[in-house]
């Protein structure tokens, strides 16, 4: 299976643009490039029934975030305070950075 590129990284603030969680904003917890999915904090929360373990002797029902497809999220720019597409630019020292397509600010 070919590895696909995902337009967001761990730690980015994103806005969910489609689905049952549309309009919610959160921080990316993890990225799964092989499946083009991201896990966003507070978005797509599901309940999982867990058996008692040494780590969690009580067991029971645990709420956790499930992954959503990366095409359903858009990077959120803090400067222009809106969702935006991502562009890439080279600085004078040759470093490659991501920039906001709306305001041109480095992300």
From Swiss-Prot:
Keywords: Ribonucleoprotein, Ribosomal protein, RNA-binding, rRNA-binding. Part of the 50S ribosomal subunit. Belongs to the universal ribosomal protein uL24 family. The lineage of its organism: Bacteria, Bacillati, Bacillota, Clostridia, Eubacteriales. One of two assembly initiator proteins, it binds directly to the 5'-end of the 23S rRNA, where it nucleates assembly of the 50S subunit. One of the proteins that surrounds the polypeptide exit tunnel on the outside of the subunit. Pfam families: KOW, ribosomal_L24. It comes from Pelotomaculum thermopropionicum (strain DSM 13744 / JCM 10971 / SI). This is Large ribosomal subunit protein uL24. InterPro entries: KOW, Rib_uL2_dom2, Ribosomal_uL24, Ribosomal_uL24_CS, Ribosomal_uL24_KOW, Translation_prot_SH3-like_sf.
């Amino acid at each position: 299976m070919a590895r696909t590129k995902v337009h967001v990284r761990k730690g980015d603030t994103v806005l969910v643009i489609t689905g049952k969680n549309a309009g919610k904003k959160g921080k990316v917890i993890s990225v799964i490039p092989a499946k083009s999915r991201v896990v966003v904090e507070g978005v797509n929360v599901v309940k999982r029934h867990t058996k008692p373990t040494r780590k969690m002797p009580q067991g029971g029902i645990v709420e956790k975030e499930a992954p959503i497809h990366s095409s359903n999220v858009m990077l959120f720019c803090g400067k222009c305070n809106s969702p935006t597409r991502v562009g890439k630019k080279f600085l004078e020292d040759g470093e490659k950075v991501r920039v906001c397509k709306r305001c041109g600010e480095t992300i």
